[in-house]
Amino acid sequence: FHNFTLLHDDIMDNAAVRRGKPSVYARWGGNVAILSGDAMLISAYRLLAQAPPALLPRILEVFNTMALGVCEGQQYDMDFESKQKVSVVEYMSMIELKTSVLVAGSAMMGAILGGADEEQSRRLYQFAIELGMAFQLQDDLLDSYGGEELGKTIGGDILEGKKSYLMVTAMSRADEEQREVLRHTYKDAALAPAEKIARVRAVFDALDVPRLTEQQISLRFDRALATLDGLNVPDARKEPLREYARSLMGRRK
């Protein structure tokens, strides 16, 4: 399911690179990317159908809610591209749907299949919500300040005019002169890519946006681990999830 979302996301974003290699969309075109994504979604349902019959209705309920949430979040993300003003609250709501719900729904399905009760399942869901938020905020930060070894085009969000967490935070803190620099730079199609990235990052730096983003990442990650710690199961059973969280957040510049 995740790869299905990425294939379709690359079409909507006109993304040339995915995981350090040409995207399916860039290499084989939109039609192949659409059909490949559709096939992956169907394959996901085929795998879900193997769940124990007694649990299948609940599993499908969680999966379908998750899938609809991801689609809703993607629509918000696209809407933000043409929206003049996006608040930090609106942005956080969008990434919860687009990213966190995917991680959280997966965690909840695993909990249900593993025999967890409702309280345990809900706690694992919340753990994954916070972890997904931390991951997406870090992804935004690394897009502008990370290294190309991560498989992303550096400054891709800036060049595409996307309203990342860094951008909406900067706009919320900037004075009118700084806002105008950001607006003009984002819209200036004639500006060389390197210069566009440098100008936007200069405003981000002046407003302390990278540090503030790091703070928010740490806050969400700490909340995730605290939620996991509160789960009433032996610690040894929680350690694989801690390892997963650390590996997910292990990407750094």
Kindly give the residue locations of the regions a language model identified:
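All-alpha prenyltransferase/terpene-synthase fold signal
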Residues: 1-253
